[in-house]
């Protein structure tokens, strides 16, 4: 019987892997999103086991004990970051696919290793003599399975001990964390052959490319304690992972992952879009890799931004764009590759095909944004490197250069002119041509040199200043790794410490300029206060500290502003976007008006305000009362923010993530990740969904639990947010989030919800403002008043004002047409009158005059009629509106060789505080000094005479 042909295409390899393990009783589990839903501390899904982490920890249980999947993974940013290596090696990627199979307390080492061998040798047809394995030095069980049961020769099974400096610190011993599930692993390697440098694993040359790891089988059989000791787990598990791209390279008989069929297609597409003929160009590899990463990120809700996952996305997109720019593509192109990616991977990942248009739009918007600054940023970077080159050359006192004829290499010594030349050359942000002109003036004999790059070719040892790298980041949108990329290509290092220092300075300035919402400057070393504001608005308390002008005090007198700290308080301190409570603190005749409540530290609240009467002293017993009306309004707006957040994700997509919020008694302001304006129809749908939840009048509920339990509830968590061991899970309608704020008891307490504003606040960030309850009523009443006033002005019922406005607009258009016709007649008559004012200058008619009340169109129309009438002329017409001046210049075709309209209009405009430009026959300008216009017009004839 003929043996079936082994699968080789990426698509076939994927399918055959899943089919194989399905035949072994495994449940095929879809790839989980790149954004981990169960771990806010992990930036991206970086392995197949991430979605099963809770199963291994024992906090989750699945309806199956065997699983297999092909997992989309990303390693860019955070601990696992391959970004800087992509494009420079054969196997580094930002995005990759991990083939895996898992056992949750079911089968163990024997089945895992035997099935791996069966799949590799019988299904994929890999030569057995090309395979070898590693095991942990003490794992005799795995060693015996390989040598005695599978039949791998002992010399091809390598024991790896504790080679990382400690007990169980080994390439072949896997740990989920410092404590918890762990165990030995067995890695399978493929030998590419002796023609490729490198030694087997465990040897001094193991980092070579000859022996490549393709599959890792992890056997979680121990639980590690804090003291480093291990005890057997009651139900050992298996976790395996094999890189799809590496396996495909082997099966397709190529050495580099970038030569496999999937990448070959993407590289062809990148070459098409950039106009590149050389398919081996490393920049094409970068672009092909990055389109996978960025498209999958968008499909999982990550859009480019300036923080967290969004910033990693931005870095990857802009790195790809820069490589396209390097290949000569100066306009957006990257988004055009999405269709090619969908053709390659859309069948395996249907969400790519479903979201193709949105992915394309997001990437195109980011490209257009970056292309606005890319060219200027590259010019600045090139100029900065030129400065470094010139400085280095001058320090060496010798320049290596080429004569323009014959390319003969010569040396020029600066001798005694070094200091002079250095002073001339080292100036900020000049261009290479300017350096060379100065250099030619300073050093005799360099007249034939054209560019600084032809003068100096040795970039080694140069360092780009950190403050300049920060300027590229801050002003031109260059991520640091992009600047590093450019510099590395030229052998230049970047002063990253200087970059960080500049970044820290800017952050410090931003903090100083803003209202810092935690009074860390107050020196309070006492105990934490107890917050009772979830349960009530009044509290009997004792004053434990008083601050006046930032300094600790024992008493506060009438008329003084200060900060009061209580042992217990019902006042909510500003946090999580919700403003601090207002109210009063009183005792006897003393009354302290609380204007704001801020945190002194996480568990201590400071009550800011003014003592209106009496005296308050440390130790006094007081009554604390929150302003009930303000608190109720704030709670309505905070609670509706949660419901709105969920509605936004339902209407706009799961990519919507909170980027900031402000909740007070007047309104809620919510900033979120989204790349396009929210349409009127979408806003209506969001309003409908939110008000539907309000009308349901369901109870809200808050539960305090540990962070792991909260993760299991599916509560929304914000990546990068620092959560404590104990968190508060809030249920409002169908929304579930972690929140420490104050909220309504039932959704019906919110009242009416109405969106009052939608706008963009930053690249990829939109803002919605909304009102509730009495605020919503006031907003609608104000709109009614506006409609009533408009109806009165139009003398029409409110229901008919849109029709009446349409009629009025048609009347306006008709009047505008009449005015335009009259202006045309006026221009014709004025042209006849002005033609007689032209003077003859060397055979050319010259006219400079004003047209009172003319607009730009009238100036142009009159100009055309005058040119027809005068035949051979140079004309300047101007009009004045207050202090502003409009100027038009025109030159007939026969005179353009001597007089250009653009030069003429600038000559006049420069005298009236303005500038302008245009074509040789017609140009426009503006000015701000009407008083200088008569003299400017009087000078036109002489100016033309010098050129005629």
Curated annotation (Swiss-Prot):
UniProt key word Zinc: yes
GO MF terms, alphabetically ordered: alanine-tRNA ligase activity; aminoacyl-tRNA deacylase activity; ATP binding; tRNA binding; zinc ion binding
Keyword Nucleotide-binding: yes
SMART domains (UniProt xref): tRNA_SAD
SUPFAM superfamilies named in the record: Class II aaRS and biotin synthetases (SSF55681), Putative anticodon-binding domain of alanyl-tRNA synthetase (AlaRS) (SSF101353), ThrRS/AlaRS common domain (SSF55186), Translation proteins (SSF50447)
Superkingdom as given in the UniProt entry: Bacteria
PROSITE patterns (UniProt xref): AA_TRNA_LIGASE_II_ALA
Cofactor note text: Binds 1 zinc ion per subunit.
Record function comment: Catalyzes the attachment of alanine to tRNA(Ala) in a two-step reaction: alanine is first activated by ATP to form Ala-AMP and then transferred to the acceptor end of tRNA(Ala). Also edits incorrectly charged Ser-tRNA(Ala) and Gly-tRNA(Ala) via its editing domain.
Domain remark in the UniProt entry: Consists of three domains; the N-terminal catalytic domain, the editing domain and the C-terminal C-Ala domain. The editing domain removes incorrectly charged amino acids, while the C-Ala domain, along with tRNA(Ala), serves as a bridge to cooperatively bring together the editing and aminoacylation centers thus stimulating deacylation of misacylated tRNAs.
Similarity annotation: Belongs to the class-II aminoacyl-tRNA synthetase family.
Name of this protein: Alanine--tRNA ligase
Annotated organism of origin: Paracidovorax citrulli (strain AAC00-1)
């Amino acid at each position: 019987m003929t043996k079936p042909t082994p699968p080789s295409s990426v698509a076939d390899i994927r399918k055959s892997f899943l089919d194989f393990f399905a035949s072994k009783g495994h449940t095929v589990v879809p790839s989980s999103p790149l954004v981990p839903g169960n771990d806010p501390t992990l930036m991206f899904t970086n392995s197949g086991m991430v979605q099963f982490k809770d199963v291994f920890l024992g906090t989750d249980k699945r309806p199956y004990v065997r699983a297999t999947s092909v997992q989309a993974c990303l390693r860019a940013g955070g601990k696992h970051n391959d970004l800087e290596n992509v494009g420079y090696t054969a196997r580094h990627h930002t995005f990759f696919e991990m083939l895996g199979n898992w056992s949750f307390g079911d089968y163990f080492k024997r089945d895992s290793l035997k099935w791996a061998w069966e799949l590799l040798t019988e299904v994929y047809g890999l030569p057995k003599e090309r395979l070898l394995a590693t095991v942990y030095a003490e794992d005799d069980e795995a060693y015996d399975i390989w040598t005695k049961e599978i039949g791998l020769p002992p010399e091809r099974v390598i024991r790896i001990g504790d080679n990382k400096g400690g007990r169980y610190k080994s390439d072949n011993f896997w740990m989920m964390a410092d404590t918890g599930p762990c165990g030995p692993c067995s890695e399978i390697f493929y030998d590419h052959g002796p023609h490729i440098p490198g030694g087997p694993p465990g040897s001094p040359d193991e980092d070579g490319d000859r022996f490549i790891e393709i599959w890792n089988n992890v056997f979680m059989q121990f639980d590690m304690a804090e003291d480093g000791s291990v005890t057997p787990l009651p139900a050992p598990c298996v976790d395996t992972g094999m890189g799809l791209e590496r396996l495909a390279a082997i099966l397709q008989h190529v050495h580099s992952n970038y030569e496999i069929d999937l990448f070959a297609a993407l590289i062809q597409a990148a070459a098409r879009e950039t106009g590149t003929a050389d398919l081996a160009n490393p920049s094409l590899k970068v672009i092909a890799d990055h389109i996978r990463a960025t498209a999958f990120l968008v499909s999982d809700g990550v859009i480019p931004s300036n923080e967290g996952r969004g910033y990693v996305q931005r870095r990857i997109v802009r790195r790809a764009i820069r490589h396209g720019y390097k290949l000569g593509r100066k306009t957006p192109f990257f988004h055009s590759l999405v269709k090619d990616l969908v053709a390659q991977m859309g069948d395996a990942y249907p969400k790519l095909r479903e979201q193709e248009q949105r992915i394309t739009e997001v990437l195109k918007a980011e490209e257009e944004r970056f292309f606005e600054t890319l060219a200027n940023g590259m010019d600045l970077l090139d100029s900065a490197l030129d400065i470094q080159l010139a400085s280095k050359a001058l320090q060496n006192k010798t320049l290596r250069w080429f004569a323009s004829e014959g390319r003969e290499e010569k040396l020029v010594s600066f001798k005694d002119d070094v200091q002079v030349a250095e002073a001339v050359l080292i100036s900020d942000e000049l261009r290479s041509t300017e350096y060379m002109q100065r250099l030619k003036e300073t050093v005799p004999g360099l007249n034939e040199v054209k560019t600084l790059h032809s003068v100096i070719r040795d970039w080694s040892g140069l360092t780009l200043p950190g403050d300049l790298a920060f300027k590229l980041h801050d002003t031109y949108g260059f991520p640091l790794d992009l600047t590093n990329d450019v510099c590395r290509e030229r052998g230049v290092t970047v002063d990253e410490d200087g970059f960080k220092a500049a970044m820290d300075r800017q952050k410090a300035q931003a903090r100083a300029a803003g209202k810092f919402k935690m009074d860390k400057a107050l020196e309070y070393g006492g105990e934490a206060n107890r917050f009772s504001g979830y349960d009530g608005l009044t509290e009997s308390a004792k004053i434990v500290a008083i601050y006046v002008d930032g300094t600790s005090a024992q008493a506060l007198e009438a008329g003084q502003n200060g900060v009061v700290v209580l042992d217990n308080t019902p006042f909510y301190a500003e946090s999580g976007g919700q403003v601090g409570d207002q109210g009063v603190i009183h005792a006897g005749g003393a009354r302290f008006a609380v204007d704001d409540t801020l945190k002194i530290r996480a568990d201590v609240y400071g009550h800011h305000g003014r003592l209106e009467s009496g005296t308050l002293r440390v130790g006094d017993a007081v009554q604390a009362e929150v302003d009930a009306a303000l608190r109720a309004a704030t709670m309505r707006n905070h609670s509706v923010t949660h419901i709105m957040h969920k509605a936004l994700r339902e209407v706009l997509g799961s990519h919507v993530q909170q980027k900031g919020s402000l909740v007070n008694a007047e309104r809620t302001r919510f900033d979120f990740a989204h790349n396009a304006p929210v349409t009127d129809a979408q806003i209506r749908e969001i309003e409908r969904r939110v008000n539907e939840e309000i009308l349901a009048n369901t109870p809200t509920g808050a539960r305090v639990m540990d962070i792991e339990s909260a993760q299991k509830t599916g509560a929304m968590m914000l990546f990068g947010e620092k959560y404590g061991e104990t968190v508060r899970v809030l249920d409002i309608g169908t929304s579930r989030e972690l929140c420490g704020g104050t909220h309504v008891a039932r959704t019906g307490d919110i009242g009416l919800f109405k969106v009052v504003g939608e706008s963009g606040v930053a690249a990829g960030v939109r803002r919605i403002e909304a009102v509730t309850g009495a605020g919503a009523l006031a907003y609608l009443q104000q709109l009614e008043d506006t409609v009533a006033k408009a109806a009165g002005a139009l003398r029409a019922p409110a229901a008919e004002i849109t029709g009446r406005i349409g009629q009025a607009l048609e009347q306006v258009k008709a009047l505008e047409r009449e005015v335009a016709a009259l202006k045309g007649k006026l221009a014709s008559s004025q042209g006849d009158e002005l033609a007689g004012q032209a003077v003859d200058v060397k055979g050319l008619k010259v006219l400079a005059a004003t047209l009172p009340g003319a607009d730009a169109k009238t100036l142009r129309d009159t100009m055309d009629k005058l040119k027809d009438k005068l035949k051979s002329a140079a004309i300047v017409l101007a009009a004045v509106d207050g202090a502003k001046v409009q100027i038009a210049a025109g030159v007939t075709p026969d005179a353009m060789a001597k007089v250009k309209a653009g030069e003429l209009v600038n000559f006049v405009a420069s005298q009236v505080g303005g500038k302008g430009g245009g074509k040789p026959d017609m140009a426009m300008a503006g000015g701000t000094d009407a008083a200088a216009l008569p003299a400017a017009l009087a000078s036109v004839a002489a100016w033309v005479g010098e050129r005629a």
